[in-house]
From Swiss-Prot:
Recorded GO MF terms: carbon dioxide binding; iron ion binding
Gene that encodes it: hupF
Gene Ontology biological process terms from the UniProt entry: protein maturation
Record InterPro entries: Hydgase_assmbl_chp_CS, Hydrogenase_HupF/HypC
Protein name: Hydrogenase expression/formation protein HupF
Entry's family note: Belongs to the HupF/HypC family.
One Pfam family, short name: HupF_HypC
Segments passing through the bilayer: none
Entries under SUPFAM superfamilies matching the protein: HupF/HypC-like (SSF159127)
């Protein structure tokens, strides 16, 4: 499973971005998100930014990752997934469209 980490861009130099990750400085490749600017949050995986995030999305992902770290250390999730607990599960749009069209088998 791949897990992206939200990081905040401090500076942009071409396709290179200086970031803060868990309080430590780092670098990410911005080739996939050329619209990213200093101050933006991006989802990074293996040294490359994959997506520009809203501050709210970055906070939700950070909370979820923090909850998983707590769980792995023997703690509990707390409210790490509060955004999911307050709603019913949803199908991805393509599966919902198939279900709405009456398709029930693969």
């Amino acid at each position: 499973m791949c897990v992206g980490i939200p990081v905040q861009l401090l500076a942009v130099d071409g396709i290179r971005g200086d970031v803060i990750e868990d309080g430590r400085p780092g670098l990410v490749d911005l080739s996939l998100v050329p619209e990213a600017r200093p101050g933006d949050w991006v989802l990074a995986f293996l040294g490359a930014a994959r997506e520009v995030l809203t501050p709210e999305a970055a906070a939700q992902i950070s909370a979820a990752l923090g909850g998983l770290r707590s769980l792995m250390a023997g703690g509990d999730l707390g409210d790490a997934f509060a955004d999911l607990e307050a709603r019913s599960p949803q199908l991805p749009p393509h599966l919902q469209a198939a279900l709405d069209a009456g398709k029930t088998r693969a």
